[in-house]
């Protein structure tokens, strides 16, 4: 029984560390948000999308509170040409309102924009 629990625990750990699916996007479509909702935050070095999500969640919790965790799973997008990440919350089908959004420069970790849809 312990062996089975160990194996099950191993799968849980492996599953939690799986890189989230990253979709493409064009940061040019988000210039309005960069202009209207700039941020002074900086996430520092970003090693991968898991690291990005951990750092983004800290920023979102500071800005919007713990309730932001209800917007999991977070969606990850990357503009390869410009080296920009976009992370968005997920709105459950039984909920109304908007989601948190953040644009981050991969090279510098600088948060370009931070906003919440309504």
Question: In which residue ranges do the predicted regions lie?
Answer:
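Hydrophobic membrane-insertion alpha-helices, especially the h-region
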Residues: 1-10
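Ser/Thr/Pro/Gly-rich low-complexity linker/stalk segments immediately outside membranes or between
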Residues: 15-25
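Short, non-transmembrane alpha-helical segments in secretory-pathway proteins
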Residues: 29, 33-73
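Exposed beta-strand-loop-beta-strand "reactive/processing" segments of non-cytosolic proteins
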Residues: 67-117
């Amino acid at each position: 029984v312990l062996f089975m629990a160990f194996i099950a625990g191993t799968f849980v750990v492996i599953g939690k560390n799986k890189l989230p699916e990253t979709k493409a996007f064009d940061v040019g479509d988000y210039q309005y948000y960069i202009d209207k909702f700039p941020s002074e935050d900086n996430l520092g070095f970003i090693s991968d999308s898991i690291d990005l999500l951990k750092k983004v969640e800290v920023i979102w919790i500071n800005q919007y509170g713990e309730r932001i965790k209800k917007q999991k799973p977070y969606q990850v997008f990357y503009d390869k040409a410009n080296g920009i990440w976009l992370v968005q919350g997920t709105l459950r089908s039984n909920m109304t309102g908007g989601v948190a959004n953040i644009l981050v420069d991969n090279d510098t970790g600088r948060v370009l924009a931070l906003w919440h849809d309504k």
